[in-house]
Swiss-Prot record:
Its EC number is 6.2.1.14. This is 6-carboxyhexanoate--CoA ligase. Its cofactor is Mg(2+). Catalyzes the transformation of pimelate into pimeloyl-CoA with concomitant hydrolysis of ATP to AMP. InterPro entries: BioW. Homodimer. Pathway: Metabolic intermediate metabolism; pimeloyl-CoA biosynthesis; pimeloyl-CoA from pimelate: step 1/1. The keyword Membrane does not apply. The keyword Lipid biosynthesis does not apply. One of its GO terms (molecular function) is 6-carboxyhexanoate-CoA ligase activity. Keywords: ATP-binding, Biotin biosynthesis, Ligase, Magnesium, Nucleotide-binding. It comes from the Bacteria.
Length: 261
């Protein structure tokens, strides 16, 4: 990838105005592509934003900018699926997994108690495992993991090797989790989607990999959750900067051809 210029392409879509003016979040997306791939990336993100089950957006922003920093290659987390028959079972297993990842049970309990407060947060909440408090200071904005991509050809090879369906939702979620858990300050991630039609969620951690729970909420529920359990004694500002700004490719082998399509 030396000598090749890459661009970070980002999309956000909302209903009833922009997010910062109280609009309802509909969709978002990220790509990292060379100049020749910009048209396809913008078209793909436009289609994603216009066809989401959360509603029809009346505001959409698609922007791109040149990536000036070296792009880091991060290996995808290993994946495991846990069949859960109810939201209660799924969330109970999530609590157990987060504790196994190294988060004190008291902090896990406090985080789950505060989930209802975080439903309006557009990005992720950073939660200190020592104090049991939110520490990102971003209010409704939260922390948006950005500047990442998983080239399609590499993702297809990975999915075939792991024997999992190569669906775009898994690709996006695992890419985010892999970048997040690569950071040394992050102990674990808890996530489930705000998509009312998608009830699967996950816990991710360096120690545990990407642990999917097949049911984490009820059908029709538009509330989502994304919490990063972090070591608050680390440099939190640096952690946020890396999650938002460090360009990352997920994958085993990344080359120019696989990134274009």
């Amino acid at each position: 990838m030396k000598g090749e210029a890459y661009y970070s392409v980002r999309m956000r879509a909302s209903e009833n105005g922009p997010h910062e003016e109280g609009g309802k979040h509909i969709s978002g997306g990220e790509r990292l592509v060379p100049f020749i791939g910009l048209n396809d990336a913008v078209s793909d993100l436009l289609e994603k934003g216009m066809s989401h089950s959360r509603g029809r957006p009346d505001f959409m922003q698609i922007q791109f900018d040149l990536v000036n920093e070296p792009i880091k290659l991060v290996q995808p987390l290993r994946i495991e699926t846990n069949e859960t028959v109810s939201a209660e079972e799924g969330q109970a297993l999530a609590r157990e997994l987060i504790s196994r990842a190294g988060v004190p049970e008291s902090a896990v309990e406090k985080a789950f108690q505060g989930i209802a407060e975080y439903w309006g947060v557009r990005g992720a909440v950073l939660f200190d495992i020592h104090s049991g408090r939110r520490i990102d200071g971003r209010k409704e904005k939260g922390v948006r993991v950005s500047r990442l991509d998983w080239p399609e050809a590499d993702f297809q090879r990975w999915a075939a090797l792991c024997g999992v369906p190569p669906n775009p939702r898994l690709k996006e979620a695992l890419a985010i989790a892999s970048k997040v858990c690569e950071h040394p300050a992050v102990i674990a991630e808890l996530c489930w989607s705000d998509d009312p039609d998608y009830i699967t969620g996950y816990v991710a951690a360096k120690k545990l990999g990407y642990q999917r729970m097949t049911k984490m909420k009820e059908h029709g529920d538009e509330s989502g959750c994304r919490i990063f359990f972090v070591d608050g004694s680390a440099d939190v500002k640096s952690c946020i900067d890396d999650l938002e700004k460090q360009p990352v490719f997920i994958g085993q082998e990344v080359n120019h051809e696989s990134i274009i399509r």
